[in-house]
């Protein structure tokens, strides 16, 4: 049956003599159109298949396209009655396998092999595909370059090199200079003229004017950005003031503060617009302060709440802009920019030397890597030489049409190469793609190339160029397309994403599902409320998984109908119809284990990141302490591992020997004792020293195998869950170490850094996961892996987890295709703080916007994979000051004129921030209700439903005992023994073990871990672990030598605000006697890197000032030496003291914690603890009483610790309630 194409599809198939750009939305049939165009050109235009160049993004796509074209040609041949035409088709079929329907890399390889003589390279080369070997060659090349500079007799050249490395000497990452050079390589290799690009790195730093305001960077980039930001704020302020009736008594008291702020803001905006000198603008912006407190007024409560939001938005914007662009004076910026020009030039020089040396090493080995193929092919086609002329002429005459699939994922080099294949004046370029699905920025893809052509080809006067838009979606049901449009209407705009989704990007439902079929008709927002849910890591918790498993079980139990295109009929959904999409694969093994526990079959499409597995964490930690044992985190990781099995209480006892030295020093001291634990310490230290000695005279691979043998670690991990996979991973590390040494490297420290860099660059060495084919199983994969695929039912998980883009926009440098941003320790001779150059400040914003745009596009890809049912699953974290209804109302208000503002989009920290405003607004406007999981039924009306998961009512069902017993039927003899042992342990745990409660806690507790006994609301928010597989086993594994996460986040939780408030009060200097110094204290913490700009702007400074000015604090100024803040303590307690349900257990628990503050008065101690909990002003007395009850136990712990320390007795205990400005005594 002939395929019926839409008018736009027909134009794309039939148009000739024009360069065409097809913008094909998800599910719009672009591959079918591309294949049909090829067939028509062969059949109707009589083009030979070898006269077409078809570039695809992946080898799989190329193979599929060849197969489709071959099948279509075979079908036409069978129908053909004309003999000459049949002969022509047979020739095309014979040539199809050699036709250039391939990836860009494969085509470039053809260019090099055919015209190698144009660039004078040895034609007998091979392709280096092993990522490890490539990294090793890079390492060797950079080492050679470093040595060459250090030994260079040209002192000026040597000084430039040393200046480059010295510029990063104070950075927290000791390898920052080398990381910059490796990162520069990735960007440079994606440029059509990388030498020119590198040489321009210093351009933004070379000021041509005396005032930075007159510079090109300021005028073309920074000024327009600032004008837009402050215009947005001014509009909000104007709207608010227009709403207020300042003539009325209720509003009048708010007028002075808003008027003053509006006036100062207007003065700054005028100064910015008229290009006043930089220092004048700086002065005016600093004066934009909002004075006064907005106290609650019940009569105009809505106005006051809105006023508070505008005030906070203004304060935050002023603070962020000042600290980003105006923190340094004009003179200081000139000094910083001059330094930036020097370092950027040096970086370009060293980078070029590194590239040249890397190329020399590859040529000597007669190998090329993938970046060489594109660079060399481009060089062949662009050189001004007779041989290059010959190459260009060959391809330009051969290819009658150039077709590029997935054009949105090309980079500048690839695009430049494609353009060189076109003959001047000949319009024979066909490009198809979808900028909304450009998700490969980490591979240097540049969606801006697509956007530029999209705009150019869409103009009426674009002669020889045409843009065609495929809007019809033939994949998804109407509820899916409606939900996608609902979300992205507000999200993708010309200033964010480069396309106006409302006008040009919406999906048009065209799937043609049978309207009579009782198919699932609603897209679901499946959520649960969680006041303890964290959203600052990428780990999925069991609550997320239980919710999804429960919903899958119900879909299967209800026999939810889906349409089967193979039979043309509906049938019940099966596990194999369902896909789960996640942002990353870090939780895949945990998800697999949880699904196995509930008996839901799951096929994992990706393995867990190799370097984050438990076994690699332990072994790499062991190598680190063999190289240098004076590292707390890796040392404790090894001690706590199954190799040595030190318990938490063992580690606590060792640490208490001396808390002021490194853990290694404490361990050596403790080993001198005469106890069993000390003997174990001595055994460990002896083995460690043996291995350290061994490492000095043996290869790294030999050291690794010796560790495996002496510790039996291979056998240990083999006995664990997924044991065979873990063993393969350890073997892979041994093989990589051997490869590292075969390239001439021997140093253990450098090997550790090499592995760290591979981890940073996501070079995965994992062995393929051992799994059978998917079969009838739920499929789990990353969103990236799902691109191009489709599934009847799609779950999107992890919407509440924070993005990890901060690592790309913090540190000593920011790198992007548009340039290099640098910051420096400043002043240069004193290095008091790290200062941004203007170039770095701007690039941070520009790169953050690019990263967030890509995250939005990634969401689009995820949502458009669903054919018949889409389920968005989120664990919604409730802020301390609001309930879900209040949160939804706040979200809905963010939609202005149907869209999110750019300012709001730039604040996004997680996928839910993108989705929630549009969903909440739709719920509000359309008056959509909510349903429980248990109330869901098939074939319901509507396109969107909010489904509340209640863990108590909607619990996922575990397999019954018969099913569990049956699951052991196919076990091996050894596995059956383990199964029986597990059953014994289960029975034992239900019976008479006398100390069962003790097995459910540890002998080492932190106050932060037992606060839930006293009801602390932020305990879970503050929890964090960077080594997930060791988290529950060991408290010492937290990264205590790294900066807290809140230093780098742009949006913050109530827990982080509380922590930041504590920090300010910890460092506030009472000795200076200045009660108005809170602002300077905060500024100092920001300058020293202890506090982020975002957090500083959101602190309740009025509350902090209130406390330091209070009567309670007056003695602190008179005798500051008697004030103690952030005092650590440790005490031994009976378990029953902490846990009222604890059975009689003879052991003790070590509790450690930190006391906010106490003051030693003449006759005793005054103990106090800061709290930032929200206090409802309407029920203040009741709320305060609850807080006193909640924290009474915690303060008693502190009191006991102080009394046992031999100090004066504790006289009184107080809670300092910052939110309501009250200090209350606790019994």
UniProtKB/Swiss-Prot annotation:
Q: Which InterPro entries match?
A: AddA, DNA_helicase_UvrD-like_C, DNA_helicase_UvrD/REP, P-loop_NTPase, PDDEXK-like_dom_sf, PDDEXK_AddAB-type, Restrct_endonuc-II-like, UvrD-like_ATP-bd
CDD domains for the chain: DEXQc_UvrD
Gene3D superfamilies named in the record? 3.90.320.10, P-loop containing nucleotide triphosphate hydrolases
Q: Which PROSITE patterns match?
A: UVRD_HELICASE_ATP_BIND, UVRD_HELICASE_CTER
Ranges for domain UvrD-like helicase C-terminal: 505-788
An example of a GO molecular function for this protein is: 3'-5' DNA helicase activity
| Assigned keywords, A-Z | ATP-binding, DNA damage, DNA repair, DNA-binding, Exonuclease, Helicase, Hydrolase, Isomerase, Nuclease, Nucleotide-binding
GO annotation, biological process = double-strand break repair via homologous recombination
* Residues reported in the UniProt entry to bind ATP: 24-31
Enzyme Commission designation? 3.1.-.-, 5.6.2.4
Which parts of the sequence belong to the UvrD-like helicase ATP-binding domain?
Answer: 3-477
Q: Which reaction does it catalyse?
A: Couples ATP hydrolysis with the unwinding of duplex DNA by translocating in the 3'-5' direction; ATP + H2O = ADP + phosphate + H(+)
| Cofactor entry | Mg(2+)
The entry's cellular-component GO terms read: cytosol; DNA helicase complex
- Top-level taxonomic group: Bacteria
- So what does this one do? The heterodimer acts as both an ATP-dependent DNA helicase and an ATP-dependent, dual-direction single-stranded exonuclease. Recognizes the chi site generating a DNA molecule suitable for the initiation of homologous recombination. The AddA nuclease domain is required for chi fragment generation; this subunit has the helicase and 3' -> 5' nuclease activities.
Per its UniProt record, what NCBIfam families does this chain match? addA_Gpos
Q: Which family does it belong to?
A: Belongs to the helicase family. AddA subfamily.
How the protein assembles, per its UniProt entry? Heterodimer of AddA and AddB/RexB.
What is the protein named? ATP-dependent helicase/nuclease subunit A
Q: Which organism is it from?
A: Lactobacillus delbrueckii subsp. bulgaricus (strain ATCC BAA-365 / Lb-18)
Higher taxonomy: Bacteria, Bacillati, Bacillota, Bacilli, Lactobacillales
